[in-house]
């Protein structure tokens, strides 16, 4: 199937997305039951029953798996889908590597990414060999394996895989050759590096540790970011206001300090805005990616609402945590 054939099908699936107005109605509800009544009129209707909130996370995962599988089978370039679902691949690598090292069974933490099964990943981690995984993934697995032979600190597994994830995003983005997609990937890496650097400054992390966690795949030079890690936050925030992200970051910088919680939310909203150009494109992969992103935002917002209603969050608490919804 070519993109000009797939994209009309994507447009049809977009009609299933929960609208801004419906989310606003759900925010205003006063109970889980009232929230469920509104969800009865959405694609999630089969998952609404007495006590639905207890199973909703598992049902969201089931919906996500079906979507990933359909897109992988339908997309002319499955790698486009993996650009988005790769975050789950690397989550699985973290979990299953820790299981291999500690001898624990962590299979229940596996998240289907549409590409690599639990068995394939476990076997690759155990044997260091795979005919099904890309060479780049095997290189990352071996790098982590070498680390684990020298260290028992499990946090290092997360650190290495997080950096490898960003490297793989950039590599695949360049390989696919879509300028708008590569721009989004680089912005994602830059904003991740900015968040990581700010957190490192606050936690007084060593230069050695920060060298390991900051990616060199963004547009802001790694050495530039590293130059701030032993300094004051004020110097870093002043620098940020000279970058291409200054207008965005002004919203989360106050009195030379950076609000990291708000930055994470702002990052999601900013990256979502990249995909809005997909509304005018009949060809290419952007409509597919826009839809995947919209579904991910929808899932995050639904989780927030269910947790919020269960724990009696105020309207203000819910609104300030909600991700931006774009009606595609």
Curated annotation (Swiss-Prot):
Keyword Ion transport appears in the UniProt entry: yes
GO terms, biological process: sodium ion transport
InterPro entries, per the entry: ATPase_csu/dsu_sf, ATPase_V0-cplx_csu/dsu, V-ATPase_V0D/AC39_subunit, V-type_ATPase_csu/dsu, V-type_ATPase_csu/dsu_dom_3
Coiled-coil residue windows: none
Source taxon at top rank: Bacteria
Alphabetical keyword list: Ion transport, Sodium, Sodium transport, Transport
An example molecular function term from Gene Ontology annotations: proton-transporting ATPase activity, rotational mechanism
Family membership: Belongs to the V-ATPase V0D/AC39 subunit family.
Main function: Involved in ATP-driven sodium extrusion.
Official protein name in the record: V-type sodium ATPase subunit C
Species in which this protein is naturally found: Enterococcus hirae (strain ATCC 9790 / DSM 20160 / JCM 8729 / LMG 6399 / NBRC 3181 / NCIMB 6459 / NCDO 1258 / NCTC 12367 / WDCM 00089 / R)
Gene (UniProt): ntpC
């Amino acid at each position: 199937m070519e993109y000009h054939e797939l994209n009309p099908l994507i447009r049809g699936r977009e009609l299933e997305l929960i609208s801004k107005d419906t989310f606003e109605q759900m925010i205003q509800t006063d109970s889980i039951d009232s929230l469920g009544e509104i969800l009865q009129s959405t694609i999630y209707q089969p998952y609404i029953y007495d006590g639905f909130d207890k199973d909703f996370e598992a049902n969201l995962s089931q919906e996500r798996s079906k979507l990933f599988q359909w897109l992988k089978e339908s997309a002319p370039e499955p790698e486009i889908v993996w650009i988005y679902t790769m975050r789950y691949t690397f989550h699985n690598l973290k979990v299953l590597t820790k299981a291999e090292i500690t001898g624990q069974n962590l299979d229940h933490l596996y998240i289907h990414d549409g590409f690599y099964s639990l068995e394939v990943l476990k076997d690759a981690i155990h044997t260091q060999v795979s005919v099904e995984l890309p060479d780049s993934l095997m290189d990352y697995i071996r790098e982590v394996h070498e680390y684990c032979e020298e260290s028992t600190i499990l946090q290092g597994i997360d650190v290495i895989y997080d950096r490898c994830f960003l490297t793989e995003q950039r590599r695949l983005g360049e390989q696919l050759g879509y300028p708008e997609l590569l721009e989004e990937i680089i912005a994602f890496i830059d904003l991740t590096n900015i968040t990581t650097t700010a957190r490192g400054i606050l936690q007084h992390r060593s230069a050695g540790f920060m060298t390991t966690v900051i990616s060199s795949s963004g547009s802001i030079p790694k050495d530039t970011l590293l130059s701030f890690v032993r300094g004051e936050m004020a110097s870093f925030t002043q620098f940020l206001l000279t970058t291409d992200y200054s207008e965005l970051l002004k919203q989360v910088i106050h009195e030379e300090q950076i609000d990291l919680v708000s930055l994470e939310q702002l990052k999601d909203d900013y990256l979502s805005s990249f995909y809005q150009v997909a509304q005018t494109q009949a060809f290419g992969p952007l409509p597919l990616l826009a839809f995947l992103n919209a579904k991910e935002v929808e899932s995050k917002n639904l989780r927030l609402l269910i947790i919020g209603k269960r724990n009696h969050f105020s309207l203000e608490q819910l609104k300030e945590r909600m991700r931006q919804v774009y009606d595609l």
